[in-house]
Amino acid sequence: MSAKASKAPASKAPAEKKPAAKKTSSSTDPSKKRTKARKETYSSYIYKVLKQTHPDTGISQKSMSILNSFVNDIFERIATESSKLAAYNKKSTISAREIQTAVRLILPGELAKHAVSEGTRAVTKYSSSTQA
């Protein structure tokens, strides 16, 4: 028993200091080029619609940016509303029905009617093209 009493508590040795790793800048190394982050926009689609309706009309970059923000905003509103509708009905999938109801709730009057009819037409066209 005297052996246990004479045993001293283990002392902790200080951690060894490691030399600091050299920081290599990726901007100085030409072999590692940094790819630019791509930004998803609706610009090409907006431009195509513009040329279908007004072939001789152009659009400025600022106007394109505003329209792109508008499309993103409407998309987000419809997605959020349709997500809520799916949750209310205890469904985990957003279907065309939820999208259509969300459009009716978000867009006012005549605009909602036109949007629903165009959306239905687009879905029908897509369905017929995938079956063929």
UniProtKB/Swiss-Prot annotation:
Compartments (UniProt record): Nucleus; Chromosome
Q: Where is this cross-link: Glycyl lysine isopeptide (Lys-Gly) (interchain with G-Cter in ubiquitin)?
A: K125
Phosphoserine sites (modified residues): S11
Q: Where is the signal peptide?
A: none
Q: Which UniProt keywords apply?
A: Acetylation, Chromosome, DNA-binding, Isopeptide bond, Methylation, Nucleosome core, Nucleus, Phosphoprotein, Ubl conjugation
Post-translational modification, as annotated: Monoubiquitinated by the UBC2-BRE1 complex to form H2BK123ub1. H2BK123ub1 gives a specific tag for epigenetic transcriptional activation and is also prerequisite for H3K4me and H3K79me formation. H2BK123ub1 also modulates the formation of double-strand breaks during meiosis and is a prerequisite for DNA-damage checkpoint activation.
Gene3D superfamilies noted in UniProt? Histone, subunit A
Q: Where is this region: Disordered?
A: 1-39
What does the protein in this record do? Core component of nucleosome. Nucleosomes wrap and compact DNA into chromatin, limiting DNA accessibility to the cellular machineries which require DNA as a template. Histones thereby play a central role in transcription regulation, DNA repair, DNA replication and chromosomal stability. DNA accessibility is regulated via a complex set of post-translational modifications of histones, also called histone code, and nucleosome remodeling.
> What's the protein here called?
Histone H2B.1
The organism's taxonomic lineage, starting at the top: Eukaryota, Fungi, Dikarya, Ascomycota, Saccharomycotina
